[in-house]
Amino acid sequence: MVRLRTLVRAIAAASVLTSGMAHGLGLGEITLKSALNQPLDAEIELLEVRDLGSGEVIPSLASPEEFSKAGVDRLYYLTDLKFTPVVKPNGKSVIRVTSSKPVQEPYLNFLVQVLWPNGRLLREYTVLLDPPLYSPQAAASAPQAPVSAPRATGAPRAPQAPAPVRTTAPAGSDTYRTVSNDTLWEIAQRNRTDRVSVPQAMLAFQELNPGAFVDGNINRLKSGQVLRIPTEQQMLERSPREALSQVQAQNQSWRGSRNPAAGSAGARQLDATQRNAAGSAPSKVDATDNLRLVSGEGKASKGADKGGKGDSKAIADTLAVTKESLDSTRRENEELQSRMQDLQSQLDKLQKLIQLKDAQLAKLQGQLGAEGQGAAQPNAALPDASQPNAAAQAPAQPGTPAAAAPTPAPAGEAPAAPAQPPVAPPPAPAAEKPPAPAVPAPAPVQAAEQPAPSFLDELLANPLWLAVIGGSALLALLVLLMILSRRNAQKEKEEAQAFAADTGEEQEDALDLGKDGFDDLTLDEPEPQVAAVAPQVEKTTAQTSDALGEADIYIAYGRFNQAAELLQNAIYDEPQRTDLRLKLMEVYAEMGDREGFARQENELREIGGAQPQVEQLKSRYPAMVAVAAVAGLAGAKLAQDELDSFSLDDLSLDDSGHAAKPDAAGQDLDDAFDLSLDDLGGDDVQADLKSDSGALDDLTLDSDLDLAASTPADKPVDDLDFGLDFAELAETPSQPKHDDLGDFSLDLDAPEDKLSDDDFLLSLNDEVPAAAPADNEFTLDTEAAEEPALSLPDDFDLSLADEPTEPAAPEKGEDSFAAQLDEVSAQLDELASNLDEPKSATPSFSAEDAAVASALDGDADDDFDFLSGADEAATKLDLARAYIDMGDSEGARDILDEVLAEGNDSQQAEARELLERLA
């Protein structure tokens, strides 16, 4: 059973592996489009969708059990996530992940489950959420101005993207001409690739176009300048951390040059955009803060004079926006300060989590890439954006381990507008110190991004190999199952044969009944002339061993009908097989088919050579013996009707009218007298009858016939088998004629002795002479004795055709008899050779012979009455015990019920006891 379960599991695993890889649906990377404190908006790419529709792909959050197996906490706010499959017009399918509430956690770790018609997918995703630092709507209302202040105002607009977005440079163009209100952040964002962060692109533009910036500061881009667009390789010359540090340093330098009187109490840029939650907050300012306009120091740009007219209007607009946002920022300042402490602790935990998840993410995602590094940059600059009252924390932050977590944009790298309240710039050494320690080696990251494919990866990427391996494994398992099933079947067959053999022996022992009530049963001895056939039966037993073996198996399981059918088919093929017929007799005895038992017994008698086995079966199944005897009588009647035989069995006649020699009683008597008159020629018999009429002295027929036979004293009879030579019969004119002899009885002079009632078949359709010599007297006496000694059945027909006293003149009825005798052929010569005794010798029957015949007759009557009265009930009890030993409870109950109805008190008590045992 354990092996079978293991095989089933292996087959199921191979089937799942083969069918799942055949379709090839997969989950790609996740792309984040929202920031912290905003409703989640992300997309998960679907790979190898092929012909699947949106309705066939069902994504959802995994079950708690799957979270538990993966070792991931299933937090409550994850239940707000909604997964929607989207098929885009370009054929690219994604799963859109959204939430109805703003996400206030810095990162999300969850399992996505995707169901489709051919299988199921599970994948873990970790999303880092950055706080929104700036929105492009901040300076939407500001007019265009050629002065440097408005140009610098647009610089902070770029950090709106929290995660790197794939952008491509304009096709067919390697340069870009700046216009009014352009910022380097926007230009760099439009021309960078996914692997390049915005700070890296900004510094690459500055390095390639140094003359386009005032004082070499990225926040002072000149209008109308033609910028050469750097390549991706040039943008990747600096690491994201180093580029971020340099951008922060230039932002602080630019703020310091713009606000020299602000001192060390530098304030953060204010975010005047409308959003649900403020992404940053400035430090507290004194109530005496004032706003004053200053001109930019250093060289002016070439287009600075052109925008002088719009300066006043731009400043007024910016001042109005600043005043509106100042009140709200003051109210949120205290709340943000407390939240920053929480965020700092969460960042520390996040650093450890990222270190632990690096290996797992590399295996599951396949490519880590610069996208993760770009996403970690805002977190690195988060302390600088959220702690305005600690100016020294900004340069120190990149040196901490938190800088390893990639974030998309730096915090506070550009001022809001000239209308900003005056703040003091941080010390110069603090601004220049961060770049030094922030020089990580990007080589290990790129090595992790593109690991060398292993053999297992190549195998999993090739569905054909997977199908071949799965099919081979399945075929091997099927072959193994077939071998095991054949072995089990062979083992079961051997066990069944062994069980059948043991059961057959037990049944033979159980059904081997004793000879309790059958000691006085006398059966006919087997004919001596066919006793030599037995060795032939043993010689050919092996030819039908298969049929006998199968029959034994059916018998052991109680399927007697199938066993009988099998044996009948085998007998039909080999009708001379006595062993098959013996086995069929045994099956009939088990089934209670008495007619079949008797029929097979008669056939075995005709074949010969199996009489001892038949007697053994009769002793085992005594209930079949009476039926066999009745079948024998029926066969005798049939033979009598067909005029096929003349039989005289166990005939013992006593000469009551004449004295017999005493030594005649010591003769060895033979109980069988069989005379076959089959195929006798009628013409020859008539000729013999006419040629000699002195063989029979006296023949008297009446409704009740008494037969008295006498023999000369000087001629003893050695054997009761004698032949009748119809040529020696003499006519008897004084003998009366009878048209019909319905009752034919032979009465002996001794009234107390009975002869055997064996078949006495005598069919003589010819005239019998009435006279015979005195020394060969054979008299049929019409005087009735005191009681009949031998009574034959009513249908016993001994017909003697009426004839006139003169045999030479037959009546008309003899013409038909002669016509019938014309058809007799083969056995006349053989019969004539056997009937060679002297004409004057007739059988001699003594008183002792009659006594022996009477005793045999009485014994036979007693033997055939063994099923009457109490003997029948006792036999049924024995049969019931045999059925119980065989396990046939139903058959035993039926027999015991009959014993309760027919038996005496002791037998009924024993039957009840057996029934209680069966209950």
Swiss-Prot record:
<feature type="coiled-coil region">
    <location>
        <begin position="319"/>
        <end position="367"/>
    </location>
</feature>
<feature type="compositionally biased region" description="Low complexity">
    <location>
        <begin position="390"/>
        <end position="417"/>
    </location>
</feature>
<keyword id="KW-0732">Signal</keyword>
<dbReference type="InterPro" id="IPR036779">
    <property type="entry name" value="LysM_dom_sf"/>
</dbReference>
<keyword id="KW-1133">Transmembrane helix</keyword>
<feature type="region of interest" description="Disordered">
    <location>
        <begin position="237"/>
        <end position="312"/>
    </location>
</feature>
<feature type="signal peptide">
    <location>
        <begin position="1"/>
        <end position="24"/>
    </location>
</feature>
<keyword id="KW-0472">Membrane</keyword>
<keyword id="KW-1003">Cell membrane</keyword>
<feature type="compositionally biased region" description="Basic and acidic residues">
    <location>
        <begin position="299"/>
        <end position="312"/>
    </location>
</feature>
<dbReference type="GO" id="GO:0044096">
    <property type="term" value="C:type IV pilus"/>
</dbReference>
<dbReference type="GO" id="GO:0015627">
    <property type="term" value="C:type II protein secretion system complex"/>
</dbReference>
<feature type="compositionally biased region" description="Low complexity">
    <location>
        <begin position="140"/>
        <end position="171"/>
    </location>
</feature>
<feature type="region of interest" description="Disordered">
    <location>
        <begin position="372"/>
        <end position="445"/>
    </location>
</feature>
<feature type="compositionally biased region" description="Pro residues">
    <location>
        <begin position="418"/>
        <end position="443"/>
    </location>
</feature>
<dbReference type="InterPro" id="IPR018392">
    <property type="entry name" value="LysM_dom"/>
</dbReference>
<feature type="transmembrane region" description="Helical">
    <location>
        <begin position="464"/>
        <end position="484"/>
    </location>
</feature>
<dbReference type="GO" id="GO:0042834">
    <property type="term" value="F:peptidoglycan binding"/>
</dbReference>
<dbReference type="GO" id="GO:0005886">
    <property type="term" value="C:plasma membrane"/>
</dbReference>
<feature type="region of interest" description="Disordered">
    <location>
        <begin position="785"/>
        <end position="816"/>
    </location>
</feature>
<keyword id="KW-0175">Coiled coil</keyword>
<dbReference type="InterPro" id="IPR011990">
    <property type="entry name" value="TPR-like_helical_dom_sf"/>
</dbReference>
<feature type="domain" description="LysM">
    <location>
        <begin position="174"/>
        <end position="229"/>
    </location>
</feature>
<comment type="subunit">
    <text>Interacts with FimL. Interacts with DgcP.</text>
</comment>
<dbReference type="InterPro" id="IPR038440">
    <property type="entry name" value="FimV_C_sf"/>
</dbReference>
<protein>
    <recommendedName>
        <fullName>Motility hub protein FimV</fullName>
    </recommendedName>
</protein>
<feature type="compositionally biased region" description="Polar residues">
    <location>
        <begin position="245"/>
        <end position="256"/>
    </location>
</feature>
<comment type="function">
    <text>Inner membrane hub protein that plays both cAMP-dependent and cAMP-independent roles in twitching motility. Regulates intracellular cyclic AMP (cAMP) levels through the activation of adenylate cyclase CyaB. Plays an essential role in a number of virulence mechanisms including type IV pilus (T4P)-mediated assembly and twitching motility as well as cAMP-dependent virulence gene expression. Also mediates type II secretion (T2S) of lipases and proteases. In addition, mediates the cAMP-independent localization of multiple T4P structural and regulatory components to the cell poles.</text>
</comment>
<keyword id="KW-0812">Transmembrane</keyword>
<feature type="region of interest" description="Disordered">
    <location>
        <begin position="140"/>
        <end position="177"/>
    </location>
</feature>
<keyword id="KW-0997">Cell inner membrane</keyword>
<dbReference type="InterPro" id="IPR020011">
    <property type="entry name" value="Motility_prot_FimV_C"/>
</dbReference>
<dbReference type="InterPro" id="IPR020012">
    <property type="entry name" value="Motility_prot_FimV_N"/>
</dbReference>
